[in-house]
């Protein structure tokens, strides 16, 4: 019984290893000071890429005014 529990534990641990390559899109998003959302980005954020192995969305703050609309004094 102990051996079968041990083998079962080894099997589960080998199945649920974290893949460091699978989260590269999430790391890239967070390094750009963006946010990762599972569902659609809120209206005040723009989607710029993906997160969580393509299952989420990388959202960035919108630019409310373009530089061409700013009046210089």
Curated annotation (Swiss-Prot):
Keywords: Antibiotic, Antimicrobial, Defensin, Disulfide bond, Secreted, Signal
GO cellular component assignments: extracellular region
Disulfide bridge positions per record: 29-58, 36-51, 41-59
SUPFAM superfamilies: Defensin-like
Biological processes annotated in GO: defense response to bacterium
Tissue: Only expressed in epididymis (corpus, cauda and caput).
Keyword Lipoprotein in record: no
InterPro entries noted in UniProt: Defensin_beta-like
Keyword Disulfide bond: yes
Signal peptide: 1-23
Localization annotation: Secreted
Similarity comment: Belongs to the beta-defensin family.
Known role: Has antibacterial activity.
Protein name per Swiss-Prot or TrEMBL: Beta-defensin 40
The organism of origin for this protein: Mus musculus (Mouse)
Gene encoding the protein: Defb40
